[in-house]
Every structure is written in structure tokens, then in C-alpha cells.
């Protein structure tokens, strides 16, 4: 923690709202919320009440709920936010539709965050007030969970990313699904990828992205251009991407997504 009660994405990174709020929520759940951070939140949002935090986060991220909804769910689970009704809902039911329809639905999250759409949506639904349509929405939960099972890689890590995987595990646990296979595999991934100092990398596999950046940086000084070209071409996806629906031939952050492996790019 920096002197002003804030955090960055890493020890060397400048402070930012997202890292600060998530860390604050974690400490709040343990009864160790720093007073300095409350001052930061007051300066940033005008206060640290439910409305201040919810409106502040939603205004910061705009209409895209890819990050704002999971962040607010964590705050609610930790007790930073007490009124679930004020938090945004996500239409987890839409996940059961054929992927080709997603482009027409104006989903509140980006396509690679469908796991978050499902987990956050189920949690928010189960924590909210019941109404006439609640039984219908409840009936979609098993179907949505089947989609989540299909999207989860063998190692349990969604997109090889600790944040997305942790959000899914947190939300499913909060929704009473802590013993579900998706939750258990997600927890296993987090336990397997934690560093010795207790931290996690933002992503466990950025090999393809880092390789291409290095190639660009080296330019004409690259010693074996032909071999590197072959490696990059080989890392192109060979099948349709299960999250985004992208056609074969594209690249992701990692080289773990191939025609023979189940996982994210």
C-alpha cells in the first residue's frame, strides 16, 4: 500500500482506482480496511457509501460492464456495498443462445468475458429480490452453468487469467455454488498459479503477445527471422474460438489455444 492508501497493478505501477478498490474490498472483508483508502475513495467518488461507490465505478467504466460488474460484485460480497438492489444485473440467460447471435444482442460485456456474464449474473440474481419472472430466470441457471462448463479450460483458468477466474469462483461461491465443478476447478487453477510471495500474475501465458512485441522491438537485429515467422504462424488459432466466435487464423495473448487443446487465446 502506498502512503495515500492506494494500490497499483504491481509494486512498481502507479496507483489506480480499480486496484485500490479491489484491494480495499479484500481488506474490508477481513476487518482491516485502511482509513487512508476511505479518504481516497471520498476524493475519487465523493464518499464511500453504496451510491458513491456504485455510481463512481459505473461512471468510470461507462456502459461496458466487463469490469465494473465483477468489481461491484466483489465489493458487495466483501460488505463494502450493502444494498444488492443498487448493483447492476447481467442477463446470464443470454449465454444459452447460439454464439452467432451475440453480435446482435448488444451484450453488456465483451465476448471474451462470457464466463463473468454468467457467474456475475447468477450471483446478482440470487442476491436480488424475487419477482414474477424469478422462477423463469432460475430455470436458466443449470443451462448457463453447462455453457460455463464448456468454456472452462482443462486447467480451470479462464483465459489463463487469475482475475477473471477469481471473479467466477467468487461469484459462484456467493451464489451458493461453491461445490460446483467449475468453482472447484477455478480454485485449483488459482492455487496452482500463486507465486511464492502470495501474488498472481495478471495472466499465466502471454507468450504470443510478448514474442510479437520482441520481434517488433528487435526489427532488423532479429537473428533468425524465418524461424520466428514459422513460430508465429504456428501459433495462429486453428479452430473457431469458443469465447469470441472468432474464425480460425487469428492470434490471442497466448499460444495455448490450438485445435487440440481446450482453452482461451
Question: Predicted regions span which residues?
Answer:
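Preference for long, amphipathic alpha-helical scaffolds in soluble/luminal domains
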Residues: 1-265
Amino acid at each position: 500500500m502506498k502512503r495515500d492508501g492506494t494500490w497499483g497493478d504491481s509494486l512498481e505501477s502507479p496507483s489506480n482506482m480499480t486496484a485500490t478498490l479491489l484491494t480495499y474490498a479484500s481488506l474490508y472483508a477481513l476487518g482491516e480496511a485502511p482509513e487512508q483508502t476511505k479518504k481516497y475513495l471520498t476524493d475519487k467518488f465523493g464518499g464511500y457509501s453504496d451510491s458513491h461507490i456504485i455510481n463512481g465505478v459505473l461512471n468510470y467504466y461507462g456502459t461496458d460492464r466487463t469490469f465494473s460488474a465483477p468489481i461491484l460484485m466483489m465489493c458487495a460480497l466483501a460488505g463494502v456495498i450493502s444494498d444488492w438492489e443498487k448493483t447492476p444485473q447481467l442477463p446470464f440467460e443470454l449465454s444459452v443462445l447460439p454464439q452467432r447471435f451475440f453480435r446482435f444482442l448488444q451484450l453488456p460485456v465483451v465476448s471474451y468475458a462470457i464466463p463473468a456474464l454468467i457467474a456475475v449474473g447468477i450471483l446478482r440474481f440470487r442476491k436480488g429480490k424475487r419477482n414474477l419472472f424469478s422462477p423463469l430466470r432460475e430455470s436458466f441457471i443449470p443451462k448457463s452453468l453447462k455453457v460455463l462448463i464448456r468454456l472452462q479450460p482443462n486447467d480451470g483458468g479462464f483465459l489463463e487469467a487469475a482475475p477473471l477466474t477469481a471473479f467466477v469462483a467468487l461469484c459462484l461461491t456467493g451464489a451458493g455454488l461453491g461445490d460446483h465443478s467449475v468453482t472447484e476447478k477455478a480454485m485449483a487453477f488459482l492455487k496452482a498459479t500463486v507465486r511464492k510471495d502470495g501474488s498472481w500474475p495478471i495472466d499465466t501465458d502471454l507468450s504470443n503477445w510478448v514474442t510479437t512485441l520482441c520481434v517488433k522491438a528487435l526489427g532488423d537485429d532479429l537473428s533468425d527471422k524465418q524461424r520466428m515467422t514459422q513460430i508465429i504462424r504456428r501459433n495462429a488459432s486453428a479452430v473457431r474460438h469458443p469465447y469470441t466466435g472468432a474464425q480460425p487464423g487469428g492470434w490471442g495473448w497466448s499460444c495455448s489455444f490450438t485445435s487440440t487443446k481446450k482453452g482461451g487465446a
